[in-house]
UniProtKB/Swiss-Prot annotation:
Similarity-based family: Belongs to the methyltransferase superfamily. Fibrillarin family.
Record-given protein name: Fibrillarin-like rRNA/tRNA 2'-O-methyltransferase
Organism field: Methanococcus maripaludis (strain DSM 14266 / JCM 13030 / NBRC 101832 / S2 / LL)
GO molecular function: histone H2AQ104 methyltransferase activity; RNA binding; rRNA methyltransferase activity
Keyword Zinc: no
Top-level taxon in the UniProt lineage: Archaea
Residue positions binding S-adenosyl-L-methionine: 87-88, 105-106, 130-131, 150-153
Subunit structure and binding partners: Interacts with nop5. Component of box C/D small ribonucleoprotein (sRNP) particles that contain rpl7ae, FlpA and nop5, plus a guide RNA.
GO BP terms in the entry: box C/D sno(s)RNA 3'-end processing; tRNA processing
């Protein structure tokens, strides 16, 4: 068994040192022995950790790249917009531990993959729906402490504001992975990031952290905001 050193860097998020100088992060396995996307499982003091691959997770990439504000914590209720097949939501569920994570996905085929890979995580609630229409799933999703958005749409920032108005508690947090090329392929990404930030601020957010997630994802920026409403 490999000798590793594990250190908590955020609530339920750990740095893992194999002694090779490479940056790695992990979450404690909520379902020991169960892989979601082929991730490596490692052990320290009889605890199983899942290595979090930043090449397959924008949140993982942001943490590796120096994210300072990580609002997803143990006991915090989360709405995850753009769940895909469940890679990042599975780590978010590990972090939330005893609290619910509502995972919204638009495509039925992808949602089936999500359910197959994440069905043993009992705190992960699959929701089939369109992030542009929060009213359609308002009978399922309760008020949450954090919204995380990874939706490749031109109106990414507007989608976050719309969902915050429905579901985010006052002074709750939101994290959004802004994909510049989904907004406008003709503009400079920095210009797009500034425009999306302006939409978020005017919509009711105070931006408290920004992290570029290259080289893991090109032309992507992670923003963290506190919801002040409007």
């Amino acid at each position: 068994m490999e000798k590793i050193r594990v250190k908590e860097i955020f609530d339920n998020v750990y740095s893992v040192d194999f002694g090779d100088g490479l940056k790695r992060i992990a979450t404690k396995s909520l379902v020991p022995g169960k892989r979601v996307y082929g991730e490596k499982l490692v052990y320290s003091d009889s605890i199983e950790y899942r290595i979090w691959n930043p090449n397959k997770s924008k949140l993982g990439a942001a943490i590796i790249n120096g994210l300072k504000k990580m609002p997803i914590k143990k006991g915090e209720k989360v709405l995850y917009l753009g769940a895909s097949a469940g890679t990042t939501p599975s780590h978010v569920a590990d972090i939330a531990e005893n609290s619910l994570v509502y995972a919204l996905e638009f495509a039925p085929r992808i949602m089936r993959e999500f359910i197959d890979s994440c069905n043993e995580r009992k705190n992960l609630i699959p929701v089939l729906g369109d992030a542009n229409r929060p009213q359609d799933y308002s009978n399922i999703v309760e008020k949450v402490d954090v919204i995380f958005e990874d939706v490749a749409q031109p109106n990414q920032a507007e989608i976050l504001v719309k969902n915050a108005k429905w579901f985010l508690k006052e002074n709750g947090y939101a994290m959004i992975s802004i994909k510049a090329r989904s907004v406008d392929v003709t503009k400079n990404p920095r210009e797009i990031f500034a425009e999306q930030k302006k939409i978020l601020i005017e919509g009711g957010f105070e931006i408290v952290d920004e992290v570029n997630i290259e080289p893991f994802e090109k032309d992507h920026m992670m923003m963290v905001g506190i919801w002040k409403g409007n």
